[in-house]
Amino acid sequence: MGLQGLCRLMSRFNSYKRTNIILQHLKMSNHTDAAAEVLLERKGCAGVITLNRPRFLNTLTLGMIRQIYAQLKKWEQDPKTFLIIIKGAGEKAFCAGGDIRALSEARNTNQKMLQDLFREEYILNNAIDSCQKPYIALIHGITMGGGVGVSVHGQFRVATEKSVFAMPETAIGLFPDVGGGYFLPRLQGKLGYFLALTGFRLKGRDVYTAGIATHFVDFEKLGMLEEDLLALKSPSKENIADVLETYHAKSKTDQDKPFILEEHMDKINSWFSANTVEQIVDNLQQDGSSFALEQLKVIKKMSPTSLKITLRQLMEGSSKTLPEVLIMEYRLSQACMKGHDFHEGVRAVLIDKDQSPKWKPADLKEVTDEDLNDYFKSLGSNDLKF
């Protein structure tokens, strides 16, 4: 996206950084090289997955998802594979999400692709969660959307000072999927609700402090960490954890820096404890602090339908298993593909680039409980199955 497009987006969001992170999440390619877009290699004691589209921030395609799932299952059964490592090529991104533009373009030409991508991606997310081998995600750089899905459900997630986490889907008429309804409400207090509704980004050690990552390692030591993991001889889960803990303990970058949201957490927990988006908005308005008004401004730019879907998704997901959440999210994904706001969000940000989505409905009060029920209803025989 050119400078002019960036400037237009800056006027729609309250900070360049938040705008840039959403743009990075949404930038997609119009072509892929299926043979090279993901590398699957046996190295030492490990199976290594490299998301290999650095020019496009390692965004996921359906072909990549299929290759990763098939190899994951093979390595899980291979007695010579003791752990699985997933990482992104290049230094900018682990994985900035899924092929959003391709999804929108498939609306009128390839309905099966809309079903297949979400179904197979969610099945992969669940397979990572249930993987019998230690699964280590090196989430250096941008990690959003689909990138979160192929990392956060793994046993170990290693952040660096360059890690950037965000779930900005409400800005384009979607919801934080790939199991967001499971892991977000399980973060401390109401942090996950805040992240889901605002698209707020976490960077560096904050990704670890928030609980997205299990370990923090200085970027300059990340290559050595990988080498030491690969050199292990028939390691147990405990051996792997010991190596990660050793590197974590030696990593001092921003060690004494407070969590970016630390001073606001009590208020976040209060504001986002409300059972409706309308009440959350009222809470922010009544507070009136600069931080509250900043978040209010962001929320008012989001799709009203997406906001309501997301709040209900997290509330229901807080008491569901991951497979149950993914079944729910598959229903939501298919409803969003048939709805207005996702395609309008893609149009405004990626196609016409006017950065002025016209949401329908345009106001929270116009999104009724009946509307929401339609998004969450069962698909019958078409429901996601594992």
Curated annotation (Swiss-Prot):
Any one Gene Ontology cellular component term annotated for this protein: mitochondrion
Location of this chain's protein in the cell: Mitochondrion
Catalytic activity: 3-hydroxy-2-methylpropanoyl-CoA + H2O = 3-hydroxy-2-methylpropanoate + CoA + H(+)
Pfam families: ECH_2 (PF16113)
One Gene Ontology term of the molecular function aspect: 3-hydroxyisobutyryl-CoA hydrolase activity
Phosphoserine PTM positions: 234, 356
Described purpose of this protein according to its UniProt entry: Hydrolyzes 3-hydroxyisobutyryl-CoA (HIBYL-CoA), a saline catabolite. Has high activity toward isobutyryl-CoA. Could be an isobutyryl-CoA dehydrogenase that functions in valine catabolism. Also hydrolyzes 3-hydroxypropanoyl-CoA.
Stated name of the protein: 3-hydroxyisobutyryl-CoA hydrolase, mitochondrial
Organism: Bos taurus (Bovine)
Lineage of producing organism: Eukaryota, Metazoa, Chordata, Craniata, Vertebrata
Originating gene: HIBCH
